[in-house]
């Protein structure tokens, strides 16, 4: 197998994709044979799990780029006391041609804007949720019974088409995976010409969760609002 190295052209492709994430607290360090995603301590202290979830979006982007470059990504989540800032490391695995779906997801990286959203059908939400492939994560359609619990977390989903991203636990690794699942589902929506907007959820103590009439599944990490893009109304002069 021919070894993969991040040369000038592949770095340019990756750089263009990462720039499209917009403001991001995660730093991508591109080495010859790997990409190291780090969470700067100064930003981590201020942003809590938001920086890790944004590292997840960067992870999803690196994954997408490696696939169109014809490589299977290999992801590691090191627990290194000497480098506590490292969120994930991505290396290029064996060669495999990208599928048409993966090319579509790569193209969709350019279409992740956040306009006003008009609700979509449950069938659309179900199709998007089914495309999540990140381990130890789930993407579910928000049920009416979950609305009060989400409101306690400061999220208003009334009249919106929403998906809930959860993880099996609440470690640093799971925050990164949640961010990857959130970003990957946004790509799936963009491929279908739907717009989306991510909403990060604060951590909720177990005691508070136990008081809810219908407990949210897993560990809630983020919401994804999905819809048809509508133009923003201009304010009257």
Map each language-model feature to its residues.
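Acidic, surface-exposed loops and disordered segments
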Residues: 1-237
């Amino acid at each position: 197998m021919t070894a993969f190295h991040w040369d000038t052209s592949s770095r340019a492709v990756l750089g263009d994709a990462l720039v499209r994430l917009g403001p991001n607290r995660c730093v991508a360090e591109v080495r010859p044979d790997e990409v190291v995603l780090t969470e700067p301590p100064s930003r981590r202290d201020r942003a809590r799990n938001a920086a890790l979830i944004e590292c997840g979006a960067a992870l999803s982007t690196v994954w997408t780029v490696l696939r169109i470059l014809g490589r299977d990504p290999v992801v590691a989540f090191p627990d290194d006391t000497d480098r506590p800032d490292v969120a994930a490391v991505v290396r290029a695995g064996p060669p495999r041609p990208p599928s048409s779906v993966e090319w579509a997801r790569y193209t969709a990286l350019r279409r992740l804007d956040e306009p006003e959203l008009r609700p979509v059908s449950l069938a659309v939400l179900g199709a998007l949720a089914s495309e999540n492939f990140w381990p130890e994560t789930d993407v579910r359609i928000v049920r009416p019974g979950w609305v009060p619990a989400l409101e306690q977390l400061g999220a208003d989903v009334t009249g919106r088409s929403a998906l809930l991203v959860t993880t099996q636990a609440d470690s640093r690794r799971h925050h990164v995976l949640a961010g990857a699942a959130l970003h990957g589902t946004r790509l799936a929506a963009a491929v279908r010409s739907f717009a989306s907007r991510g909403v990060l959820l604060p951590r909720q103590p177990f005691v508070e969760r136990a008081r809810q009439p219908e407990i949210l599944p897993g560990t809630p990490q983020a919401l994804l609002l999905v819809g048809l893009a509508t133009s923003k109304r201009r304010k009257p002069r």
